[in-house]
Amino acid sequence: MNLFTPGPVNISVAAQQAIGRPRMFHHRSDQFRTMMTKLTSHLKNAFMTGGEVLTLTSSGTGAMEAAVSNLLSPGDRVLVPVSGKFSRRWAEICEAYGIDVIRTDLEPGDAPDADVIISALEADPEIHSVLLTHCETSTGSLTDLEPVCAAISHLEQASGREILKIADCITSLYVDELRMDDWGIDCAVAASQKGLLSPPGLAFVALGKRALDRLESNSSSAYYFDLWRYLRRKPPFTPAIPLVDATLASLEYLAGLGPEAVWQAGRSGAAALRLLAGAAEMKPVARRQASGVVAFWTEGLDTAKIGRALEREHYIIVAQGQAELKGRILRASPIGKSPAMLRGFATAFSGVLAKTGRTLDMDSIRAEFDRLLEDCAIWE
């Protein structure tokens, strides 16, 4: 089955081989400690941080909850720009912990820019943290974190406030450009099943100096997600050892390719999918578009029927719209997809659309499509 979903994605050959190895370590053994040390080193390089990166056995939402429960306290006031299902999740987690959430609601496909963020922060001096979503997976929109974080830092310097910058990078790590330290991100969270080309089940919390300082001064109500436990003893509980093995193997593979080549493959793969959608007269949902997922409006089409046909006839799975976008959009991801996979998707998508009466004019885009696929050859 070819997963064109924005997570889980098809895992790398390196991860497959690691899972297939008939070995198991005890989580207190020297062998496993060595494995965790290597994993953490690669994760620091992936986030581009000199801070701490902690590995949890959970989904990405677990990393989000760990960040909230350890860095924030009941009654704290935070800003959450909401542009879709996953940015809304930040707000829902915060509210579950008794945190006072100031929401900035955006239209589907929009992403918060520096002006929106700064306006909200200036209007309320009690806000001391901003929870951002790098890639809003429900719409494919990308928040430009570099200028947003720079604007927040400038406001901090001018006002004397400390405003923690916390980012969901679950669909952007090793997909879109991410430079945690250079951009001034204090805490970033991610998971194994997307850009790391690994099975689901591991989540990561990257902490810069200011986040570590906040962690030290904050009283957490968490137990399993108490990050001090992970800092003192890595890991504090029995981890998913085969997943650590597989994710380390995949990170070593990605490191060999280099982040710039991986980011470019993501950009070009996403552009190729947008080209296909455009040739079928489908418009993108996002104004500023991420590489990890391409979402496009499907006006006049039965999205569920298209999804079923792709799966049953071509063994390709795409994602439907969620919440208020259900039945209105389709979502596809180019993460880890080779030129052959993308060409196969183009053929299948064109054939399925033709049965609905919608034409995908492949001849008009073939030259540009093939040019974009050259950058995706790293996945062959």
Cite the ranges covered by each PLM segment.
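Active-site C-terminal subdomain of aminotransferase-like
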Residues: N10-I11, Q193-L275, A377-E380
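Active-site phosphate-binding strand-loop segment of PLP-dependent enzymes
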Residues: P112-Y174
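Conserved N-terminal alpha-helix of the aminotransferase class I/II PLP-enzyme fold
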Residues: A18-A66, R89, I93
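Conserved PLP-binding active-site segment of the aspartate aminotransferase-like
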Residues: A295-G300, I317-T347
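Conserved PLP-dependent catalytic core of the aminotransferase class-I/II
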Residues: K38-F47, L251-V285, R308-A309
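PLP-dependent enzyme catalytic core of the Aspartate aminotransferase-like
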Residues: L330-E380
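Conserved PLP-anchoring active-site segment centered on the Schiff-base-forming lysine
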Residues: L72-R88
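Conserved PLP-binding catalytic core of the aspartate aminotransferase-like
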Residues: K283-E313
